[in-house]
Amino acid sequence: MEKHELIEVYKDVFPFWDKMGELDKATFLRSSQTVYFTRGENIHDGNECTGIILVKTGCLRLYLLSEDGKEITLYRLFPGDMCMLSASCVLDAITFDVIVDAEEDSECIVVGGCAYEDLARRLPEAKIFALETALSRFSDVMWVMQQILFMSMDKRLAIFLLDEVAKSGSDTVKMTHEQIAKYMGSAREVISRMLKYFTSEGLVSVSRRDGVKILDRRRLRDLTL
Protein backbone atom coordinates (compact mmCIF):
# COMPACT_ATOMS: atom_id res chain seq x y z
CA MET A 1 0.00 0.00 0.00
CA GLU A 2 1.30 3.44 -0.95
CA LYS A 3 2.11 5.93 1.81
CA HIS A 4 -0.67 8.34 0.87
CA GLU A 5 -3.20 5.49 0.86
CA LEU A 6 -2.07 4.39 4.30
CA ILE A 7 -2.41 7.93 5.62
CA GLU A 8 -6.02 8.05 4.39
CA VAL A 9 -6.74 4.74 6.13
CA TYR A 10 -5.26 5.99 9.39
CA LYS A 11 -7.16 9.27 9.21
CA ASP A 12 -10.32 7.20 8.99
CA VAL A 13 -9.65 4.62 11.73
CA PHE A 14 -7.56 6.54 14.28
CA PRO A 15 -9.48 9.58 15.60
CA PHE A 16 -6.30 11.00 17.14
CA TRP A 17 -4.32 11.05 13.86
CA ASP A 18 -4.55 14.82 13.38
CA LYS A 19 -3.29 15.38 16.94
CA MET A 20 -0.06 13.50 16.26
CA GLY A 21 3.14 15.37 15.48
CA GLU A 22 4.87 14.86 12.14
CA LEU A 23 7.65 12.81 13.74
CA ASP A 24 5.11 10.49 15.40
CA LYS A 25 3.25 10.10 12.12
CA ALA A 26 6.45 9.19 10.31
CA THR A 27 7.34 6.62 13.00
CA PHE A 28 3.81 5.21 12.86
CA LEU A 29 4.01 4.78 9.09
CA ARG A 30 7.46 3.18 9.25
CA SER A 31 6.21 0.65 11.78
CA SER A 32 3.30 -0.35 9.54
CA GLN A 33 3.29 -3.12 6.98
CA THR A 34 0.82 -4.92 4.78
CA VAL A 35 0.89 -8.64 5.56
CA TYR A 36 -0.78 -11.54 3.77
CA PHE A 37 -1.84 -14.51 5.88
CA THR A 38 -2.90 -17.88 4.52
CA ARG A 39 -5.89 -19.80 5.83
CA GLY A 40 -5.06 -21.48 9.15
CA GLU A 41 -1.90 -19.44 9.74
CA ASN A 42 -1.23 -18.30 13.27
CA ILE A 43 -0.93 -14.51 13.52
CA HIS A 44 -0.68 -13.94 17.26
CA ASP A 45 0.03 -16.57 19.91
CA GLY A 46 -0.50 -14.48 23.02
CA ASN A 47 3.17 -14.30 23.96
CA GLU A 48 4.38 -11.44 21.77
CA CYS A 49 3.16 -7.88 21.27
CA THR A 50 2.30 -8.43 17.62
CA GLY A 51 0.69 -5.04 17.17
CA ILE A 52 -2.62 -3.65 16.01
CA ILE A 53 -4.15 -5.55 13.12
CA LEU A 54 -6.49 -3.92 10.60
CA VAL A 55 -8.33 -6.42 8.41
CA LYS A 56 -8.51 -5.43 4.73
CA THR A 57 -9.74 -8.72 3.27
CA GLY A 58 -10.51 -12.16 4.65
CA CYS A 59 -11.43 -13.18 8.19
CA LEU A 60 -9.52 -13.63 11.45
CA ARG A 61 -10.55 -15.71 14.47
CA LEU A 62 -9.72 -14.87 18.09
CA TYR A 63 -9.86 -17.67 20.62
CA LEU A 64 -8.67 -18.94 23.97
CA LEU A 65 -6.75 -22.20 24.34
CA SER A 66 -7.14 -24.28 27.50
CA GLU A 67 -4.38 -26.36 29.05
CA ASP A 68 -5.94 -29.52 27.60
CA GLY A 69 -5.97 -28.05 24.10
CA LYS A 70 -9.63 -27.06 23.90
CA GLU A 71 -10.31 -23.94 21.81
CA ILE A 72 -13.03 -21.42 22.66
CA THR A 73 -13.78 -18.97 19.87
CA LEU A 74 -14.37 -15.45 21.20
CA TYR A 75 -15.24 -13.63 17.99
CA ARG A 76 -14.20 -13.10 14.39
CA LEU A 77 -12.88 -10.05 12.59
CA PHE A 78 -13.96 -9.08 9.08
CA PRO A 79 -12.83 -6.41 6.59
CA GLY A 80 -12.81 -3.03 8.29
CA ASP A 81 -12.42 -4.51 11.78
CA MET A 82 -9.47 -3.87 14.08
CA CYS A 83 -7.75 -6.27 16.48
CA MET A 84 -6.40 -4.48 19.54
CA LEU A 85 -5.97 -7.54 21.80
CA SER A 86 -2.94 -8.56 19.73
CA ALA A 87 -1.16 -5.46 21.06
CA SER A 88 -0.75 -6.71 24.62
CA CYS A 89 2.07 -4.25 25.40
CA VAL A 90 -0.41 -1.40 24.91
CA LEU A 91 -3.14 -3.01 27.03
CA ASP A 92 -1.25 -3.66 30.24
CA ALA A 93 -4.50 -3.91 32.21
CA ILE A 94 -5.61 -6.98 30.21
CA THR A 95 -3.82 -10.07 31.43
CA PHE A 96 -5.37 -13.01 29.56
CA ASP A 97 -3.80 -14.27 26.35
CA VAL A 98 -5.79 -14.58 23.15
CA ILE A 99 -4.69 -16.36 20.00
CA VAL A 100 -5.38 -15.00 16.53
CA ASP A 101 -5.50 -17.19 13.41
CA ALA A 102 -6.44 -16.45 9.81
CA GLU A 103 -9.71 -18.24 9.18
CA GLU A 104 -9.45 -17.35 5.49
CA ASP A 105 -6.67 -16.05 3.27
CA SER A 106 -6.41 -12.49 4.58
CA GLU A 107 -4.72 -9.20 3.84
CA CYS A 108 -4.04 -7.03 6.87
CA ILE A 109 -2.26 -3.87 7.91
CA VAL A 110 -0.17 -4.44 11.04
CA VAL A 111 0.91 -1.47 13.15
CA GLY A 112 3.94 -2.31 15.30
CA GLY A 113 3.02 -2.71 18.95
CA CYS A 114 6.12 -0.93 20.25
CA ALA A 115 5.44 2.14 18.10
CA TYR A 116 1.86 2.35 19.32
CA GLU A 117 2.91 1.75 22.93
CA ASP A 118 5.40 4.62 22.73
CA LEU A 119 2.76 6.90 21.24
CA ALA A 120 0.17 5.91 23.86
CA ARG A 121 2.56 6.92 26.66
CA ARG A 122 2.71 10.47 25.33
CA LEU A 123 -0.70 10.91 23.72
CA PRO A 124 -3.63 10.15 26.06
CA GLU A 125 -6.06 9.99 23.14
CA ALA A 126 -4.13 7.04 21.68
CA LYS A 127 -4.24 5.18 25.01
CA ILE A 128 -7.94 5.87 25.47
CA PHE A 129 -8.70 4.71 21.93
CA ALA A 130 -6.83 1.44 22.51
CA LEU A 131 -8.73 0.72 25.72
CA GLU A 132 -12.11 1.68 24.26
CA THR A 133 -11.52 -0.49 21.19
CA ALA A 134 -10.58 -3.49 23.33
CA LEU A 135 -13.47 -2.97 25.74
CA SER A 136 -15.97 -2.72 22.89
CA ARG A 137 -15.26 -6.39 22.17
CA PHE A 138 -15.81 -7.60 25.70
CA SER A 139 -19.56 -7.81 25.17
CA ASP A 140 -18.77 -10.49 22.56
CA VAL A 141 -16.49 -12.27 25.02
CA MET A 142 -19.08 -12.15 27.81
CA TRP A 143 -21.75 -13.49 25.43
CA VAL A 144 -19.54 -16.49 24.68
CA MET A 145 -18.87 -17.09 28.38
CA GLN A 146 -22.59 -16.82 29.14
CA GLN A 147 -23.38 -19.45 26.53
CA ILE A 148 -20.74 -21.85 27.85
CA LEU A 149 -21.68 -21.44 31.51
CA PHE A 150 -25.45 -21.12 31.43
CA MET A 151 -26.92 -22.41 28.15
CA SER A 152 -27.81 -25.95 27.15
CA MET A 153 -25.92 -27.46 24.23
CA ASP A 154 -28.96 -27.59 21.94
CA LYS A 155 -29.53 -23.85 22.45
CA ARG A 156 -25.84 -23.06 21.91
CA LEU A 157 -25.69 -25.12 18.73
CA ALA A 158 -28.88 -23.55 17.38
CA ILE A 159 -27.45 -20.07 18.01
CA PHE A 160 -24.18 -21.04 16.34
CA LEU A 161 -25.84 -22.45 13.21
CA LEU A 162 -28.17 -19.47 12.82
CA ASP A 163 -25.29 -17.01 13.29
CA GLU A 164 -23.23 -18.80 10.65
CA VAL A 165 -25.94 -18.81 7.98
CA ALA A 166 -26.70 -15.16 8.76
CA LYS A 167 -23.04 -14.27 8.10
CA SER A 168 -22.78 -16.31 4.91
CA GLY A 169 -26.20 -15.48 3.48
CA SER A 170 -26.64 -19.17 2.76
CA ASP A 171 -28.77 -21.91 4.32
CA THR A 172 -25.76 -24.20 4.81
CA VAL A 173 -22.94 -24.22 7.34
CA LYS A 174 -20.01 -25.70 5.43
CA MET A 175 -18.09 -27.07 8.39
CA THR A 176 -17.26 -30.51 9.70
CA HIS A 177 -18.42 -31.67 13.12
CA GLU A 178 -14.83 -31.26 14.29
CA GLN A 179 -14.71 -27.63 13.14
CA ILE A 180 -18.02 -26.78 14.78
CA ALA A 181 -16.84 -28.39 18.02
CA LYS A 182 -13.61 -26.39 17.88
CA TYR A 183 -15.41 -23.10 17.40
CA MET A 184 -17.84 -23.87 20.22
CA GLY A 185 -15.27 -25.20 22.67
CA SER A 186 -16.94 -28.60 22.78
CA ALA A 187 -16.16 -32.19 21.76
CA ARG A 188 -16.84 -33.63 18.30
CA GLU A 189 -18.88 -36.47 19.79
CA VAL A 190 -21.17 -34.01 21.56
CA ILE A 191 -21.76 -32.00 18.37
CA SER A 192 -22.36 -35.14 16.30
CA ARG A 193 -24.90 -36.39 18.83
CA MET A 194 -26.73 -33.07 18.90
CA LEU A 195 -26.77 -32.77 15.09
CA LYS A 196 -28.19 -36.28 14.91
CA TYR A 197 -30.99 -35.14 17.20
CA PHE A 198 -31.59 -32.00 15.10
CA THR A 199 -31.74 -34.21 11.99
CA SER A 200 -34.30 -36.55 13.57
CA GLU A 201 -36.44 -33.51 14.39
CA GLY A 202 -36.28 -32.26 10.80
CA LEU A 203 -34.39 -29.11 11.73
CA VAL A 204 -31.28 -29.78 9.65
CA SER A 205 -29.77 -32.24 7.21
CA VAL A 206 -26.14 -33.29 7.46
CA SER A 207 -23.75 -34.55 4.79
CA ARG A 208 -19.99 -34.88 4.65
CA ARG A 209 -19.80 -33.00 1.37
CA ASP A 210 -22.14 -30.08 2.06
CA GLY A 211 -22.00 -29.71 5.84
CA VAL A 212 -25.11 -28.76 7.81
CA LYS A 213 -28.15 -27.46 5.91
CA ILE A 214 -30.87 -25.61 7.79
CA LEU A 215 -34.29 -27.07 6.93
CA ASP A 216 -36.56 -25.37 9.47
CA ARG A 217 -35.18 -22.01 10.50
CA ARG A 218 -38.24 -21.01 12.52
CA ARG A 219 -38.17 -24.08 14.77
CA LEU A 220 -34.41 -23.82 15.11
CA ARG A 221 -34.81 -20.21 16.18
CA ASP A 222 -37.41 -21.30 18.75
CA LEU A 223 -34.67 -23.31 20.47
CA THR A 224 -32.71 -20.11 21.08
CA LEU A 225 -35.50 -18.43 23.04
Language model segments and positions:
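A generic structural motif
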Residues: Y63-E67, D101-E103
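Cyclic-nucleotide recognition modules
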Residues: Y75-E132
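Phosphate-/nucleic-acid-contacting segments
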Residues: L162-L225
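Cyclic nucleotide-binding regulatory module and flanking cytosolic helices
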Residues: M1-T38, M82, A87-V90
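A short beta-loop-beta micro-motif enriched in histidine and acidic residues
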Residues: R30-S31, N42-I52, K70-I72, T95-F96
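Short, locally clustered residues in the helix-turn-helix/winged-helix DNA-binding domain
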Residues: H44, K56, L162-A166
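Glycine- and acidic-residue-biased ligand/ion/polar-headgroup-sensing regions
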Residues: G40, T50-Y63, F78-G80
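Polybasic "coupling" helices that flank or enter modular domains
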Residues: E103-E104, R121-S186
